[in-house]
Amino acid sequence: MFDDQDLGFFANFLGIFIFVLVIAYHFVMADPKYEGN
């Protein structure tokens, strides 16, 4: 079972991962060269 330290690390990692994913998605969607398809 997870203790508080493991849970905190996992939540922090998941938050950073989602944040990076959203930023990357935004850059791909905002880049004009991808809109021509």
Curated annotation (Swiss-Prot):
Topological domain ranges for the Lumenal compartment: 1-8
Primary subcellular site in the record, as a coarse category: endoplasmic reticulum
InterPro entries xrefs: Oligosaccaryltransferase (IPR018943), OST4_plant (IPR044165), Ost4p_sf (IPR036330)
Topology in the lipid bilayer: Single-pass type III membrane protein
Disulfide bonds: none
Keyword flag Ligase: no
Cytoplasmic side: 30-37
Family affiliation: Belongs to the OST4 family.
PANTHER family: DOLICHYL-DIPHOSPHOOLIGOSACCHARIDE--PROTEIN GLYCOSYLTRANSFERASE SUBUNIT 4A-RELATED, DOLICHYL-DIPHOSPHOOLIGOSACCHARIDE--PROTEIN GLYCOSYLTRANSFERASE SUBUNIT 4B-RELATED
Function: Subunit of the oligosaccharyl transferase (OST) complex that catalyzes the initial transfer of a defined glycan (Glc(3)Man(9)GlcNAc(2) in eukaryotes) from the lipid carrier dolichol-pyrophosphate to an asparagine residue within an Asn-X-Ser/Thr consensus motif in nascent polypeptide chains, the first step in protein N-glycosylation. N-glycosylation occurs cotranslationally and the complex associates with the Sec61 complex at the channel-forming translocon complex that mediates protein translocation across the endoplasmic reticulum (ER). All subunits are required for a maximal enzyme activity.
Protein's name according to its UniProt entry: Dolichyl-diphosphooligosaccharide--protein glycosyltransferase subunit 4A
Organism, as annotated: Oryza sativa subsp. japonica (Rice)
